[in-house]
């Protein structure tokens, strides 16, 4: 599967493509392995150029967390349906899921330290009904120019 024609072949990083028909199987396999599933809803890399950056970072995050994460890319044709299911509002977004629970979302490209901090908190937080709040990280808009 090619993420962006002629540039990044994500299968070489062990990232499979999932769609509406295969996502539950992927999530179940991650649960069986004791890992947290990380789904990339990238969007069109021509519209969202940072999608390519997030796609490059995801395999690095998986490696950094030493087997605690399993990653996949959502097929473009199913991004809308699966985005609604998991609460995606912007693209690109990383979706963290364990045991049927959406643990959190990290949108857009972030500094490495932000990824490590937020993912560590998502992995370590308690699960269940008292911990149902998902963390969504969206960078704040910064105005440019002179303030008067």
From Swiss-Prot:
Task: Show the InterPro entries listed in the entry.
Answer: NiFe-hyd_mat_HyaE, Thioredoxin-like_sf
Under the heading CDD domains, the entry gives: HyaE
A Pfam family of the record is HyaE
Judging by the UniProt lineage, the source's domain of life is Bacteria
What does the sequence similarity comment in the record state about its family? Belongs to the HupG/HyaE family.
UniProt-recorded name of the protein: Hydrogenase expression/formation protein HupG
Q: Which gene encodes it?
A: hupG
């Amino acid at each position: 599967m090619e993420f962006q024609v002629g540039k990044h072949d994500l299968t070489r990083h062990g990232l499979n493509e999932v769609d509406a028909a295969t996502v539950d199987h992927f999530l179940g396999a991650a649960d069986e392995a004791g890992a947290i599933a990380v789904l990339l809803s990238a969007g069109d890399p021509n519209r969202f150029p940072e999608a390519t950056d997030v796609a490059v970072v995801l395999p690095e995050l998986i490696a950094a967390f030493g087997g605690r994460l399993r990653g996949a890319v959502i097929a473009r044709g199913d991004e809308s349906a699966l985005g609604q299911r998991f609460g995606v509002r912007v693209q690109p977004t990383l979706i963290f899921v364990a045991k049927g629970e959406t643990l959190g979302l990290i949108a857009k490209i972030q500094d490495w330290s932000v990824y490590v901090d937020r993912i560590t908190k998502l992995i370590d937080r308690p699960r269940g009904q008292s911990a149902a709040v998902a963390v969504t990280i969206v960078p704040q808009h910064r105005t440019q120019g002179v303030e008067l």
